[in-house]
């Protein structure tokens, strides 16, 4: 049986305070994300030929899956992927400005870090309903985009480097309807060391 696992966080639920409260984080990770993982495993249970596929392989090739599980994999696999990256690119010691190679390419494609912040914040805040704002590698270029529901940039052939979750369950207990305030505060949690590592990995993967 396919057995995707809920990832363990590298920080405690209260360590992203005051920007993300511990109650929200514990429910978001321990309940919402866990449900996506369980539902994904259930969808794949009877398809042994898919049990050795990575999450990225499944999401990049949805059109090749049995039609009766496409929606379940898209929604729950997407939810697992999006949340896993969301946790990964945050840190109690986050915030500040980008460093390393990714800082240079951000300056190249956005002119300044503030321009990136502005564009990504607008993409996240203006996403109607539920979804995500992303910084992605598109070929050799960096760009900003947003996706609805649990869709990922992988489905468009782009490599995600940074993501913010703007589903209401990501912020409503603390911020209620104040999504812009949540997005502004979220920047204080961004783990730029990890974003830089993901950029370098993405560039390397494109060489193979």
Curated annotation (Swiss-Prot):
Q: Which SUPFAM superfamilies match?
A: Fe,Mn superoxide dismutase (SOD), C-terminal domain, Fe,Mn superoxide dismutase (SOD), N-terminal domain
Per UniProt, the cofactor note for this protein states: Binds 1 Mn(2+) ion per subunit.
Report residues binding Mn(2+). Answer: 28, 83, 165, 169
Q: What is its cofactor?
A: Mn(2+)
A UniProt-annotated Pfam family: Sod_Fe_N
Q: What class of enzyme is it?
A: oxidoreductase
Q: Does the keyword Metal-binding apply?
A: yes
Does the keyword section mention Metal-binding? yes
Cite the EC number: 1.15.1.1
Q: Which UniProt keywords are given for this protein, alphabetically ordered? A: Manganese, Metal-binding, Oxidoreductase
Q: Name one GO molecular function term.
A: superoxide dismutase activity
Quickly give the catalysed reaction.
2 superoxide + 2 H(+) = H2O2 + O2
Which Gene Ontology cellular component terms are annotated?
A: cytoplasm
The subunit field of the Swiss-Prot or TrEMBL record says: Homodimer.
The job of this chain, per UniProt, is described as: Destroys superoxide anion radicals which are normally produced within the cells and which are toxic to biological systems.
The family assignment reads: Belongs to the iron/manganese superoxide dismutase family.
Name used for this protein in its record: Superoxide dismutase [Mn] 2
Organism encoding this protein: Bacillus anthracis
């Amino acid at each position: 049986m396919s057995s995707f696992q809920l990832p363990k966080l590298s920080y405690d639920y209260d360590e992203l305070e005051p920007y993300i409260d511990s109650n929200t984080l514990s429910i978001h990770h321990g309940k919402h994300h866990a449900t996506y993982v369980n539902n994904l495993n259930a969808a794949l249970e009877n398809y042994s030929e898919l049990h050795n596929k990575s999450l990225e392989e499944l999401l990049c090739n949805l059109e090749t899956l049995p039609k009766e599980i496409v929606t379940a994999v898209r929604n729950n696999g997407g939810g697992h992927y999006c949340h896993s990256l969301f946790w990964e690119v945050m840190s109690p010691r986050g915030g500040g400005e980008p460093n390393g190679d990714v800082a240079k390419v951000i300056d190249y494609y956005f002119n300044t870090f503030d321009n990136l912040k502005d564009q990504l914040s607008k993409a996240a805040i203006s996403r109607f309903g539920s979804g995500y704002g992303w910084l992605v590698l598109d070929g050799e270029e960096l760009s900003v985009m947003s996706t609805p529901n649990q869709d990922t940039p992988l489905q468009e052939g782009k490599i995600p480097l940074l993501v913010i979750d703007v589903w209401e369950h990501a912020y409503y207990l603390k911020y209620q309807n104040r999504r812009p305030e949540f997005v502004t505060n979220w920047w204080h949690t961004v783990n730029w060391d990890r974003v830089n590592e993901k950029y370098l990995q993405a560039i390397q993967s494109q060489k193979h």
